[in-house]
């Protein structure tokens, strides 16, 4: 079985760890160098423990030093790190111009461990710094020479330290080195600090402080970002910016920086107490296999494969995660099949057992559901005699056992087709889709808010509907009354006819207008009196 059979998983990495004997600022505990190394390893063991605490289980470290990989080699040769640390990467740190505060900009070169033996020739001897018209490389001998050129009274160790401190190459010299060696570039991940102290931001601040216009530094800043692969920063604002999710769009970040960039972060430990403990618990989580190629994959998917957070990203409850399954059948391997807690895909050619595997996995967990869906989909799949499914919470499902303590959704082949053929307004497809959508926090929150809004507006809406129905009823009654009375035109014609009859009869009976008026008044008075008597 492969060592990392589950695929990419979130694990803690710390790519910026100095060791005892580091070329600058060694503050590890112990009077002698061997004592400091012993205390260093003990601190690591104490921190990681048995590895059960995921927030303290470090899978990869970048052994960091200024212009040297000697301490990296010592760590590899001594083999005293916990077994949980699967990958150790050489991280060469140096300063480059332009200046950031009192030093150059902090830049790191993380090398593929496979090319460590080549670095003396292809990297250290090719680095270039000029002092007093003489070119110096970054080999130990040349750094000692540089130190002595600066102060001839120094012994070799002191001269070496002096040379390391003063060796500050230019961005152009570094760019040329890697441009001339494609193999070296392919096996190197270059990371620059964005700190306001020793990073690109610090250099920009210095430029402004000495009277320059900050925009005049843009070309230099962008040249640095275009040269590197990633950023060393625990600042959430930096992480958003270099993903194109802040002041600049993704296209604009790519234009300025060459690509979207991941932000890594490390403890930058120079003391025992600082090991694996960056400020504010800004731990670096990376989703990949602990390998150099796994780390390189982050460069292509920076948004999905790295997080700076105190807690593991996307962590699920153990009772929601299938850990593995074991099949006891002569046609299958007896080795456990391990699952990723995010996404597992069953890949294979036709008739290689994909449906059998999925069917028996579901059948072992929820037999009733599987049998009902198989009946509807009209499919037949081979049933294996003995299967065990192991959950991350320790629960075990076995073939034939009735156990519905864990919920799954099983969708056999042709099942959705069968549901689609049903002439019903709502089918199980709707429930399946809704359940999947509701797994998204934003969708679920929006749905819950919508239901709340409906509940809040319902009384007002009900009243408006009632009023509309009442008014409509009144209108219908009025229309019915009008229909019984008759149309307006007919009534007007009838009035005209009655008026004509009145005029005719008045003439025939010699009734004067005054008599008619008195008669109308009497009728009106009589009507009033009858109303009063009632």
Q: Language-model segments: which ranges?
A:
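Phosphate-binding glycine-rich loops of NTP-binding sites
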Residues: 61-62, 113, 340-373
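Long, non-membrane, amphipathic alpha-helices that form coiled-coils
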Residues: 440-534
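P-loop NTPase motor core
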Residues: 379-455
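Hydrophobic, aromatic-enriched interface-forming segments
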Residues: 143-213
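Nucleotide-cofactor and metal-assisted catalytic machinery
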Residues: 65
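Charged catalytic cores and adjacent phosphate/nucleic-acid-binding surfaces used
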Residues: 1-57, 70-89, 94-126, 195-351
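Flexible, acidic/histidine-containing loops and adjacent segments that form or flank the divalent-metal
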Residues: 93-168
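Short beta-strand-centered segment that lines the nucleotide-binding/catalytic pocket of NTP-utilizing
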Residues: 368-384
